[in-house]
Amino acid sequence: MSNALTNIFYKYVARRNSTWMAGAILGAFVLDSTVSGAVNTFFDSVNKGKLWKDVYAERVKKGISQ
């Protein structure tokens, strides 16, 4: 079983440099997007009520801003 999976991996992925590069670039893009989204969500939750988007929404609700 393991040998068959290794052969498939080599035949379709590891054999050509272009597939390695495509996988590395795609993996980096997915990792960057995931980490950025998680960090931004965490930052927004820690600073809830202190960010301009929260202050502005409150001002609009009170009728102070447009």
Swiss-Prot record:
GO terms for biological process: mitochondrial electron transport, ubiquinol to cytochrome c. The keyword Transmembrane applies. Residues 47-66 are mitochondrial intermembrane. Gene3D superfamilies: Cytochrome b-c1 complex subunit 9. It is a single-pass membrane protein. It comes from the Eukaryota. Pfam families: UCR_UQCRX_QCR9 (PF05365). This is Probable cytochrome b-c1 complex subunit 9. It comes from Dictyostelium discoideum (Social amoeba).
